[in-house]
Design a protein with these regions (language model features):
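Conserved, structured core segments of small domains
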Residues: 1-111
Length: 111
């Protein structure tokens, strides 16, 4: 059976995350968005985004990486300004899907 492999990174907000000002959070968020924009441009991330209204509010986001190893996905995740500030705690795992399964677009929303 032919499959495509991604590395799924779950981003958890630790209970003991550092306290930051609104300005610091805004700066980190801008860097976070730029980091993932760049990873998508480099074809290292297939897609990523926030997670809301789930059973565990500490799960804040996820990313599907196109890397050769879990270690590489983790390294790219930890290069994110938010991760360097110890806001998300990443968990990396394999994710397999049928070839071409990720080509369908999602439903458009406006936030």
């Amino acid at each position: 059976m032919e499959l495509e492999k991604f590395f799924l990174v779950l981003l958890w907000r630790p209970a003991d995350h550092p306290a930051l000002s609104a300005e610091e959070i805004s700066t980190l968020q801008a860097g976070h968005l730029a980091h993932y924009d760049n990873l998508r441009r480099l074809n290292r991330v297939a897609f990523n985004g926030p997670v809301r209204e789930g059973p565990d509010e500490s799960l804040r986001g996820l990313a599907f990486f196109r890397t050769r190893t879990a270690a590489e996905a983790l390294e790219l995740t930890l290069a994110d300004p938010m991760a360097r500030a110890q806001w998300p705690r990443p968990e990396v795992m394999d994710f397999w899907t049928q070839p071409g399964a990720t080509t369908a677009p999602g439903l458009p929303i406006t936030i």
